[in-house]
Amino acid sequence: MSLIHMNVMMAFSMSLVGLLMYRSHLMSALLCLEGMALSLFIFTTLTTLNLHFTLANMAPIILLVFTACEAAIGLALLVMISNTYGTDYVQSLNLLQC
């Protein structure tokens, strides 16, 4: 396993640990999710380039599109929550209410 793959896996695991530790603020959780998505994008790009798997060349681009959609929805949710509640604490949300 190359050094680049180990660094990408370490970045993914650090983002996962950050998501598990700093989940009180929505902005911190969104940043950790973006770090995980970026690590997955780099890993899938490196894998398709190293294996010369031409049928999967679109997979990193599709992952990048879904990551952009996730970021847009997350930021819209963050703006809505901060306008409604005044903070971005996840504990202030009651997900059982409509």
From Swiss-Prot:
Core subunit of the mitochondrial membrane respiratory chain NADH dehydrogenase (Complex I) which catalyzes electron transfer from NADH through the respiratory chain, using ubiquinone as an electron acceptor. Part of the enzyme membrane arm which is embedded in the lipid bilayer and involved in proton translocation. It comes from the Eukaryota. The keyword GTP-binding does not apply. It is an enzyme of class 7 (translocase). It is a multi-pass membrane protein. The keyword NAD applies. It holds the Pfam family Oxidored_q2. It comes from Physeter macrocephalus. Belongs to the complex I subunit 4L family. Core subunit of respiratory chain NADH dehydrogenase (Complex I) which is composed of 45 different subunits. The chain crosses the membrane at residues 1-21, 26-46, 61-81. Keywords: Electron transport, Membrane, Mitochondrion, Mitochondrion inner membrane, NAD, Respiratory chain, Translocase, Transmembrane, Transmembrane helix, Transport, Ubiquinone. InterPro entries: NADH_UbQ_OxRdtase_chain4L/K, NUOK/Mnh_C1-like. Its main location: mitochondrion. This is NADH-ubiquinone oxidoreductase chain 4L. It catalyses: a ubiquinone + NADH + 5 H(+)(in) = a ubiquinol + NAD(+) + 4 H(+)(out). GO terms for cellular component: mitochondrial inner membrane; respiratory chain complex I. GO terms for molecular function: NADH dehydrogenase (ubiquinone) activity. It is found in: Mitochondrion inner membrane. PANTHER family: NADH-UBIQUINONE OXIDOREDUCTASE CHAIN 4L, NADH-UBIQUINONE OXIDOREDUCTASE SUBUNIT ND4L. One of its GO terms (biological process) is ATP synthesis coupled electron transport. Its EC number is 7.1.1.2.
